[in-house]
């Protein structure tokens, strides 16, 4: 599985997920500097936090 890894809306960077991390993840939230994005490989889909705008977990290459 490969997942996107950059903190931008348009993301060309991907990484091959290590063993045990078979979910691609993307979280968006607002800060005083504007919208922030986190993308990576995870073992479990995290819960949506109170400050999060959106949360995406998926199991296809580069789906985040």
UniProtKB/Swiss-Prot annotation:
Highest taxon, organism lineage: Eukaryota
Tissue expression notes: Expressed by the venom gland.
Pfam families for the chain: Toxin_cobra-type (PF21947)
InterPro entries with a match to the protein in the record: Snake_3FTx, Snake_toxin-like_sf, Toxin_cobra-type
GO biological process, one term: modulation of receptor activity in another organism
Annotated disulfide bonds: 3-24, 6-11, 17-41, 45-57, 58-63
Protein localization: Secreted
Single GO molecular function: ion channel regulator activity
Keywords: Acetylcholine receptor inhibiting toxin, Disulfide bond, Ion channel impairing toxin, Neurotoxin, Postsynaptic neurotoxin, Secreted, Toxin
Principal subcellular localisation of the protein: secreted
GO CC entries: extracellular region
Family: Belongs to the three-finger toxin family. Ancestral subfamily.
Record-given protein name: Long neurotoxin MS4
């Amino acid at each position: 599985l490969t997942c996107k890894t950059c903190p931008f809306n348009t993301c060309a960077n991907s990484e091959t997920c290590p063993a045990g991390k078979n979910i691609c993840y993307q979280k968006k939230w607002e800060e005083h500097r504007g919208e922030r994005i986190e993308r990576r490989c995870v073992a479990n889909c995290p819960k949506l936090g109170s400050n999060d705008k959106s949360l995406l977990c998926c199991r296809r290459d580069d789906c985040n």
